[in-house]
């Protein structure tokens, strides 16, 4: 008599799938959850970490009996990458990004040693031990996830197609985007998930570095300005240029806004005769890169490409013998910000204070105050210091500490018809302006305390529409649908007593002149006492020969897209000259 045993087919288990998901999600989503709960960023990081961590289920589905081995091998890689990212966040309060790689590769050996030594603090060791213990515990709970054939292949392909192949096919073949741009977009989505933050970060870093190197080489090949003269003498001096972000003057009490959003600058304006407030300066482009390609060079709306063929303001100051510094709280190395990094690398020394993965992450401009003080103490006889702020960049609530929301819930002086979400944004923007006021005033005060021979100029790169213009439904910036608030900017000049003594000038008759930020390099040259072939005193807002011209706005690369700023409606609103 023969007995036969029929081996039962293993069954699919939701519990086993749940543990597998939890295991792979743990390595990426924990950090993203901490970032979100801390209020430093939104939910996109959590979403993308959950989605792209799920790719590791594919080998688990295909080879269920080997789940422990597969999970261990993959887990070691995920553990190392995610632990490094977690420790970086604990130490620096920032998410790992390609900007971090840029700064790391630009760092000298001593600085790198200081950086690495921080990882071996007791706090980091305890975090690493706890993190490892949880990872091992989750690994011990793993069980095979059996999906019957051929469904395991279908499910695995569906995961791969939905997360990788479909976005590539849609963007490349349907939307006709360049394949390189498609990969960049996919890499950005994958970045929150371990170990992709390192792989995509390095890929993006290399892409931007190649572009950066090319632009810098082209800039270095430019001939110097001809017939160059510095008429300011040989005395030691320090000149400061502070670049703000997304700050429109119509929301500053300094310019008549009824809410007290700039109390420190208001006080300085009342007590310090050397602070001049210009009332009628507008930007030409409502986007950071595009306007700085004009404001920091000889380019303008009619000649937008001159930034490629003529020296920049930074080149000019180095030609005049200045040691140049760039302190920035903007992102360092991204596809969008490559030109900013090019400008910064045209200076002698850079301080990159913001390594966040996204611009819409919580970061405060007080970051710049310490390096600013350090540079003020630099012994160089002639110094140019450029400080680039995040200002009031969206998301506005991430530009100031959570406990400093002075205008939260305030309905005074609010446009009619705003819903709760719009009111929150409106008040957040005023809170951001209040914090920006503190930073800008602190820079002026710190500069003044150094007893310098020089001057400081502050302007915002562009404005921001935050439900200001009727019918009060627009927020942000749109060059194709412009409002005055997108272009109206603060423009301040502070001169030291020493500078005023040797360069006596009265700017009181200049403050209401109509001026475009695109012509800044001529005003800066005038203030600094520089002349050369191409300098035009009629384009300097502080020169007696100044001539008002049409203030063009719009995209100069589009046919018939330029319009006269002064033809825009609602010029009677506060700050809308």
Swiss-Prot record:
Identify the keywords attached in UniProt to this record, alphabetized: Cell inner membrane, Cell membrane, Lipid biosynthesis, Lipid metabolism, Lipopolysaccharide biosynthesis, Membrane, Transferase, Transmembrane, Transmembrane helix
Q: Where in the cell is it found?
A: Cell inner membrane
Against Gene3D superfamilies, the record matches this protein to: Alkaline Phosphatase, subunit A
For the biological process aspect of GO, one term held by this record is:
lipopolysaccharide core region biosynthetic process
The way it spans or sits in the membrane comes to: Multi-pass membrane protein
InterPro entries to which the protein is assigned, alphabetical: Alkaline_phosphatase_core_sf, EptC/CptA, PEA_transferase, Sulfatase_N
Q: Name one GO molecular function term.
A: phosphotransferase activity, phosphate group as acceptor
Q: Main EC class of this protein?
A: transferase
- Enumerate the SUPFAM superfamilies for this protein: Alkaline phosphatase-like
Assembly: Forms a complex with an unidentified protein of approximately 36 kDa.
The record's comment on protein family reads: Belongs to the phosphoethanolamine transferase family. EptC/CptA subfamily.
State the name under which the record lists this protein: Phosphoethanolamine transferase EptC
Native species of this protein? Escherichia coli (strain K12)
């Amino acid at each position: 008599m023969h007995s036969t045993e029929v081996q039962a087919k293993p069954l699919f288990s939701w519990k086993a799938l749940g543990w597998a998901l939890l295991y792979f999600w743990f390595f990426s989503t924990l950090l993203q959850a901490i970032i979100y709960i801390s209020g430093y960023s939104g939910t996109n990081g959590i979403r993308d970490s959950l989605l792209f961590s799920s790719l590791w289920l594919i080998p688990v589905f295909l080879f269920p009996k080997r789940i422990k081995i597969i999970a261990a091998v993959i887990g070691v890689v995920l553990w190392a990458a995610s632990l490094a990212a977690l420790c970086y966040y604990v130490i620096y309060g920032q998410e790992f990004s390609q900007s971090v790689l840029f700064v790391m590769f630009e760092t000298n050996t001593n600085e790198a040693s200081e950086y690495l030594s921080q990882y071996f603090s007791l706090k980091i060791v305890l975090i690493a031990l706890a993190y490892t213990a949880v990872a091992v515990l989750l690994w011990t709970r793993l069980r095979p996830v059996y999906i019957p054939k051929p469904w395991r292949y279908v499910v695995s392909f569906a995961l791969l197609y939905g997360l990788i192949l479909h976005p590539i096919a849609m963007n490349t073949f349907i939307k006709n985007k360049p394949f390189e741009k498609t990969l960049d977009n996919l890499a950005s989505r994958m970045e929150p998930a371990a170990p992709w933050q390192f792989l995509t970060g390095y890929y993006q870093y290399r892409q931007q570095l190649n572009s950066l190197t090319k632009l810098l080489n082209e800039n270095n090949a430019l001939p110097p300005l001809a017939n160059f003269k510095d008429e300011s003498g040989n005395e030691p001096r320090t000149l400061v240029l502070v670049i703000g972000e997304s700050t429109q003057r119509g929301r500053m009490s300094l310019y008549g806004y009824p809410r007290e959003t700039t109390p420190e600058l208001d006080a300085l304006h009342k007590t310090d005769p050397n602070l001049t407030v210009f009332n009628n300066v507008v930007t030409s482009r409502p986007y950071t890169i595009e306007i700085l390609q004009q404001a920091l060079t000889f380019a303008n709306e009619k000649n937008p490409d001159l930034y490629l063929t003529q020296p920049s303001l930074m080149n000019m100051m180095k030609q005049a013998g200045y040691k140049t510094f760039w302190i920035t709280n903007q992102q360092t190395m991204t596809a969008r910000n490559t030109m900013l990094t090019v400008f910064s690398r045209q200076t002698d020394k850079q301080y990159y204070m913001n390594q966040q993965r996204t611009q819409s992450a919580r970061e405060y401009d007080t970051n710049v105050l310490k390096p600013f003080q350090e540079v003020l103490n630099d012994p160089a006889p002639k110094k140019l210091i450029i400080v680039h702020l995040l200002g009031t960049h969206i998301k506005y609530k991430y530009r100031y500490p959570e406990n400093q929301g002075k205008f939260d819930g305030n309905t005074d002086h609010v446009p009619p018809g705003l819903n709760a979400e719009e009111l929150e944004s409106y008040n957040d923007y005023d809170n951001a302006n209040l914090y920006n006021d503190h930073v800008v005033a602190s820079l002026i005060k710190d500069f003044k305390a150094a007893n310098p021979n020089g001057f400081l100029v502050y302007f915002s790169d562009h404005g921001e529409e935050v439900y200001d213009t009727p019918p009060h439904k627009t927020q942000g910036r749109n060059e194709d649908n412009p409002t005055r608030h997108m272009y109206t900017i603060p423009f301040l000049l502070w001169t030291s007593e020493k500078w005023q003594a040797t360069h006596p000038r009265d700017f009181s008759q200049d403050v209401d002149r109509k001026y475009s930020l695109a012509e800044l390099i001529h005003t800066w040259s005038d203030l600094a006492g520089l002349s050369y072939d191409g300098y035009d005193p009629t384009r300097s807002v502080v020169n007696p020969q100044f001539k008002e011209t049409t203030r063009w706005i719009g995209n100069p690369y589009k046919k018939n897209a330029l319009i006269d700023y002064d033809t825009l409606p609602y010029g009677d609103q506060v700050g809308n000259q």
